[in-house]
Amino acid sequence: MPSVYVGMVCDLLHEGHINVWTIAHAKGDVTVGLLTDEAVESYKRRPIQAWKDRKTIVSAIRYVKDVIPQPTLDYTENLRALKPDFVVHGNDWVTGPQASARQAVIDCLAEWGGVLIEPAYTDGVSTTSLIEKIKCT
C-alpha cells in the first residue's frame, strides 16, 4: 500500500481536515505529521488545544493510520525518514508564510520520486474563521 504524509495543525477539527484526509486515504496509508505547539506558534498563533489533545483527536479519525510530531514548519526531516509516495496539503500554502516549506517539500519529494497533491482549500472553512465565529457569539 502506498504511503501518504499529511502535515497539519488540526487545532479545531472541521470539514476541510476531513476533505484532506479523504483525498489522502484514497492514495494510501496516511501518516499525519501533527505540528507541535512550538511549530505552530512560529508562524501564526499558539494553538487552542495542546499537541497531545490534538493527537488524541486526529488518532481517532478512521482515515489516519499514524500520528507523529512535526517539530518545525519544515517537513523534510519527517519526509526523509518516511519517504512517502505522496504528500497531501491544501493549496493554501502556495503563497504566504508556508511557501518556503512547500518548496522544500517539492525538492525533498524529488529525491525519491514522491508526488505532492494539493487539493483546493475548502472555501470558507478554517480554524481562523471558526475562532472568529466563536468570538462573535
Identify what each model region corresponds to:
Residues 1-137:
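Nucleotidyltransferase catalytic core that binds NTPs
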